[in-house]
């Protein structure tokens, strides 16, 4: 099994910590919230052994990577720029990009905006959707009004940070159990409570002292140590740029994704539970080669089902290079 090594790379004005293994065509893995390169621990050696140079950065604001203080420094333009700069810093001209959760918009947008660099894209949990006619926060406020919705709760700097950083281990356990296939009742209402106008985010998740089978105490220790050190401000700033990114992405309205693409999700993932997601994806992605739905799996796709995820990713990668 390929050994994972770590180093730092200068990219787009920040220093990024990367995990990497293998030699061959470049594959970049973009993690989600609240995670780090470590969420790809089951994929990096497998893809490397299959003949790829696999790189998983801690993204802007996470882990060992720099966390600029300004909220405005976390738009999708910044995040895509980080990955473009990473590819160039590695001495490469092209890459396949794979993203999960928040890493999925980074991957989708990287492929949409820089098709000259990203020759293929596969995303987990968060499907591709066209740019909407109104700003995302406006749409959310129209839908939820004054009721609790986690993305709106995350908007005010300091509020969610205070809650999430109070007991980091409990926070990480609640996230990783509560959004997984191990938790009961995977419905979108878990993250939007129409009965409460004033609520806390962790109240919406179903915590458990018993870890799911796919998560070890050592895994939880790693995530806890990383977020105890780095905090949640940088990661939460990603959520605070929905409208700013929407405004800046106007020139890309109607852009088609023409490179080969794939989508993978668990059938118990509450993020994917929009019945129209496949039609929306096919509206934008003209070469969507496969949609893979993994039974019994929740939001943490590649951690909950590493073998099924690896099989799907290798099938996609070999289709590009076959």
Where is each model-derived feature located?
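Conserved HGGG/HGGXW glycine-rich cap/lid loop of the alpha/beta-hydrolase fold
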Residues: 17-66, 281
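Catalytic active-site module of serine/aspartate enzymes centered on a nucleophile-bearing elbow/loop
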Residues: 287-322
């Amino acid at each position: 099994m390929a050994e994972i090594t770590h180093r730092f790379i200068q990219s787009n004005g920040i220093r990024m910590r990367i995990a990497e293994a293998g030699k061959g065509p470049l594959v970049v893995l973009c993690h989600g919230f609240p995670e780090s390169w470590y969420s790809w621990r089951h994929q990096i050696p497998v893809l490397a052994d299959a003949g790829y140079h696999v790189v998983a950065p801690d993204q802007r604001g996470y882990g060992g990577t720099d966390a600029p203080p300004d909220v405005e420094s976390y738009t999708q333009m910044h995040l895509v720029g980080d990955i473009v700069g990473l590819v160039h810093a590695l001495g490469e001209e092209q890459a396949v990009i794979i993203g999960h959760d928040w890493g999925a918009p980074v991957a989708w947008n990287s492929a949409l905006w820089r098709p000259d660099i990203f020759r293929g894209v596969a995303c987990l949990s968060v499907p591709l959707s066209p740019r909407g006619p109104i700003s995302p926060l406006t749409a959310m406020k129209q839908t939820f009004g004054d009721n609790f919705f986690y993305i709106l709760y995350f908007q005010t700097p300091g509020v969610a940070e205070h809650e999430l950083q109070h007991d980091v281990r409990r926070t990480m356990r609640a996230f990783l159990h509560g959004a997984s296939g191990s938790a009961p009742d995977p419905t979108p209402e878990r993250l939007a409570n129409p009965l409460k106008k004033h609520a806390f985010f962790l109240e919406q998740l179903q915590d458990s002292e018993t870890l799911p089978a796919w998560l070890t105490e050592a895994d939880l220790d790693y995530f806890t140590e990383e977020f105890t050190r780095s905090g949640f401000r940088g990661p939460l700033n990603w959520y605070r740029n929905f409208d700013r990114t929407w405004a800046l992405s106007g020139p890309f309205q109607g852009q088609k994704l023409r490179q080969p693409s794939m989508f993978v999700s668990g059938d118990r993932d509450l993020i994917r539970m929009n019945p129209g997601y496949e039609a929306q994806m096919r509206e934008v992605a003209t070469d969507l080669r496969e949609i893979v739905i993994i039974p019994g799996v929740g939001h943490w796709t590649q951690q909950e089902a590493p073998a099924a995820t690896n099989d799907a990713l290798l099938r996609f990668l070999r289709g590009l290079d076959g």
